[in-house]
Amino acid sequence: MRAFNRNQKIFCLILAVLFCACARPSRLLADDKDSTAPPAKPASAKPNSPAPLSERERWMLDRMEQLEKRVAELESRSNAPAAPATVAAAAQPVSATAGEPVSAASAITAAAPSATVIPAQPAVATAAVQEKAAAAAAPVKAEPFAFADFTWLNGNARTKELAFDTKFFTPEIRADVDYVYDFRHPKDDTISGSSEIFRSSEVQVTQLGVGGDFHYDNVRARLMTQFGMYSQTTPRNDASPARGQWNLADAYRYVSEAYGGYHFNALHGINVDAGIFMSYVGLFSYYQFDNWAYQPSYVSSNTPWFFNGVRVQIFPTEHLKIEPWFVNGWQSYGRFNNRPGFGAQILWRPNGWLSVLGNQYALGEDTLNTPGRVRYHTDDSIQIKYYDNPEKFMDKAAFSLTGDMGCEHGGGVSCAGGSAKGPKQSFLGYMFYNRLWFDNDRYGLTIGGGQINNPGRYLVLLPPINGATAITGTPYFTENPGDPYKAWDVSGTFDWMPSQYITFRWEYNHRAANVPYFTGPGGVTPPGGNNGAPGSFVCLTGISICNGSPTNTWLPDLRKSENRATFAILVKF
């Protein structure tokens, strides 16, 4: 409106000037000519007819008409409702050279917005833009467990920065190389009773993993290889390939993780994956780089490292994960009998210093060729970071506590024991670890250990006597209903971590059992190497029939305890 009032005043001023010009046309004409030009002659006209318009007058009338149109246009704009139209950039301001007058019309043109206007978008397009704006303004749901730094957890990788990442692929490389010194000096360099350590007085590649995570358009997949000792030792602990054909142990021998799935943008995320994935029953990771110790206690070492099946990871909040499983069996590539296994994990992290984990397993028939024997197991852990002061030399401290209970019933055994169904077949154990970090996490010290009681030995790792596996069994260490087994261990671990991608680890372990179980100086390999069927006695030289008697049978050297030292280099990118 102010622009309109200003234009109205200018318009009145021009009218006054025009009136004066009409009253004295000769003066106006003289002003338009050069001062040296001769005076113009007046034109003849009828006495009552109007005088003819000069060129200057016609120009001024044209300018007045343009001004009237501009004023009308301004009035229509000021009275029209606001529309979501985009106005083109205003004309550049009129610049005048010093001493050169600026006409009123030019001033009005410069002051008014440009007449070039982009038409308003259709209502549908406007609505779409508004919807996109609303979606952009909507709060983004927090990523699960991203609210704090959980690299301190036992079983979690401590790397905080990815070495390399793309929109489609996040690579991962792991190397685990160790040297173990067994104080009993077994002559065949074989170590029994562990799912992490296998040879003595030798440098061995426990695992070389190459792979990573694929992720694009909500589709996900993961691959991790297991070259090295794991490719032999992990499959030999699974008896399910003995049922049926196609050599499942060989088919999966060189992969530790292999699955594909889809991510749903619901709640705080839902992942559906199928294939081989880590179980984390027993808290410790399958990969030693992620753990506080190299040799975990029995509660971890004797429980599943992987499952083959389908999992659904549901994140209702950024603090909670609920993960049901449908799997072939208890750390198995296939089924042992006619029934698969079912389980679930619940993980709750309310803040940055507390993690509560529960793994439950049920209904699987996991004893080979024994249908009707059903397994149940619960594995529950709590981890607390009770000290955190980065400015001190000892900058962090935390502990983990894990408790496990389980049993089997049916097929000649019972959970309680002392019944007509059979002897007690159960598992009870715990482990506790305390870790300290020093010098901004460059050094770590862990003390821990645990204890188990497993009558029936259904979760005891079978010693590799004469090449025995979970499929063959061995008469030298039976796993029959009612067979007793109690064990305990303690360890001390020192880590030097000059980079977040490497750990130099020194560890001492003492392990013991109530029955001869660990490899002694005589080893667990017959003279000259494995001899005959692994599930049978090995006869002494020159004897064709043997029954386990020392007079006719070769006997492995098994002891009730072991002491060993381990040095390992662990790498993860």
List where the protein language model places each region.
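N-terminal periplasmic/intermembrane-space "pro-region" immediately following the signal or transit peptide
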Residues: 28-188, 550, 573
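Glycine/serine-rich loop-strand microenvironments at binding/catalytic pocket rims
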Residues: 95-138, 216-239, 243-246, 315, ...
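Outer-membrane beta-barrel pore domains
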Residues: 234, 243-248, 354-364, 370-573
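Gram-negative outer-membrane beta-barrel domains
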Residues: 32, 47-51, 123, 128-133, ...
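Bacterial N-terminal signal peptides
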Residues: 12-22
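Outer membrane beta-barrel
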Residues: 121, 131, 142, 157-329, ...
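Bacterial N-terminal signal peptides that target proteins for export
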Residues: 2-13
